[in-house]
Each structure stands twice: as structure tokens, then as C-alpha cells.
Amino acid sequence: LLQYAPITAKVIAGMPELGIVSRIGAGYDTVDTEACEKAGVWVANSPDYGVGEVATHALALALASIRNIVAYNRDIHAGTWYFQSSGTLPRPSTMTLGIVGLGRIGKRMAHIARNTFKRVVAYDPYLIDGDFPAYVERVHSLAELAREADVVSVHTPLTSETRGMLDARFFAAMKRGTYLVNTARGAIVNVPDLLMALDSGVIVNPITAS
């Protein structure tokens, strides 16, 4: 039973009586599933763990980013706060939220954010149209989501397919001044490409998992 400890092939080899690895959490990218399969070890996760908490946290981070809360807080503590230091900030009610990955957390995020943003769009190639709530507009590619969204919230698991998925091509399709929140796994975002997008002004106030 674990939460954060990595279960590698070496760990599995050193525990010959191991029968099951059960993770407290939805993701299991820290578990070497191939090594477990070879050793006959079962792997289990907790798919409903923290769904509401992560979705609420993602929305809070998105709003903090849009309203420049962190910078304002820093300025207040430094005694340099000025109400126009960030210029005119956008209203979420005029913005489109784009969700990458419409699983449990992505759907909860869409549900709690739908009355905050003007529109909610989502990309998830593994779902059929009937799996999309009525208040979520489906987009059919990451590039389409990048073009439509003012705020991008990432809720996809880390797999060989999604590793580095948000890269230079994705950022190039974005509007200038887009906000990015990644509460999934840091490796989904190509960090060097993100830094270039940040330097160019395409991305504003990015928040991403490590």
C-alpha cells in the first residue's frame, strides 16, 4: 500500500512474496506495471481519490492566475502594491475554459467551472459524444482546443502517449495571453517549450505540477 513511493523493477525483485501493489491515488505512473506483470503482481489504484479536491484546486489556481493574485500578494507584502500594476485583467465570464482529459477530475472541473466561464470546451479522444456533458463543447484535436481556449486546464494521466504532449506545436496554436494550469503530471508538459511560450507572451502565469 503506497502513495508516493516509486515501485521499480528493482523493488519488485527484492520482494519475492509481493502479491499486490495498491496505490492511494488515481495515477499509477510511479509503478513499473510491466515488471509487476512479469512477476505476477497485481496493481490496483483508487480512481475516485481526491476528485473533488483536485478539481476545486485547479479552478482556484486558474482564477488566481487570471486575477494575478500571487503577484498582488507579493506586492502587498513588499509594500509596493498598486491597483493598476497589472493593467486591466480579464473577466472569467468572458473567457473560454479548455479542458484536456475529460475523466473524473476533468468532468468535475467542467461542472464546477461552467458558471464561472463563458464556455467550456474539452478534448478527450477516448470518449464518445454521449460521454460529454451538455454544457461541455467537444473539440476534436489539441490544436483546436489551443485555438479556442483562453484558459487550459490539464487532467489527463501520464502515459507514453501523453508524455510531452503539450509542446511547441500546441503552444504555437494558442492565442497570445493564454493561461495554463496543470494539476495532472508535470511531464505532460514539455518544459523547454513552455518556457519559450512564456518568454514570447503566449502563456501568462503558468502553473504546472512537478
List where the protein language model places each region.
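Redox-cofactor binding/interface segments in oxidoreductases and associated redox assembly factors
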Residues: 1-2, 23, 153-154, 182, ...
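Short glycine-/small-residue-rich Rossmann-like dinucleotide-binding loops
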Residues: 4-5, 26, 150, 156-158, ...
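Rossmann-like dinucleotide/phosphate-binding beta-alpha-beta segment
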Residues: 84-176
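Rossmann-fold NAD(P) dinucleotide-binding segment
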Residues: 6-19, 32-35, 160-180, 191-195
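A short helix->loop->beta-strand "cap" motif at the edges of active sites that frequently abuts
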Residues: 15-20, 39-41, 117-118, 176-178, ...
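Phosphate/diphosphate ligand-binding glycine-rich loop within oxidoreductases
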Residues: 1-73
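Rossmann-like dinucleotide-binding domain for NAD(H)/NADP(H)
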Residues: 43, 170, 176-210
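Phosphate-binding beta-alpha-beta segment of Rossmann-like dinucleotide-binding domains, i.e.
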Residues: 39, 47-96, 108-111, 115, ...
